From Swiss-Prot:
It holds the Pfam family UBact. The lineage of its organism: Bacteria, Bacillati, Armatimonadota, Chthonomonadia, Chthonomonadales. The gene is ubact. Residues 1-12, 33-64 have a biased composition (Basic and acidic residues). This is Prokaryotic ubiquitin-like protein UBact. Belongs to the ubiquitin-like protein UBact family. InterPro entries: UBact.
Length: 64
């Protein structure tokens, strides 16, 4: 009866590293541009120039 419940051992797979094997500073690929987030007041001012109604709707939606 104990032979019915005998299970095979699971095969252990090798654990892969969590980070890819890259050299730091190789400089071969594209890099993220260094830009800061725009100021919201500047954004509203530019939106008013382009479309005043869109600026009003954005102001209501964002709570400003």
């Amino acid at each position: 009866m104990s032979d019915l419940f005998r299970m095979e051992e699971r095969r252990q797979m090798p654990i892969l590293p969590t980070e890819p094997a890259r050299k730091e500073g190789d400089g071969g690929g594209p890099q993220k541009p260094d830009v800061k987030r725009p100021d919201t007041s500047d954004l509203l001012r530019r939106m008013k120039r382009v479309d005043p109604d869109a600026a009003r709707r954005y102001r209501q939606r964002s709570g400003e």
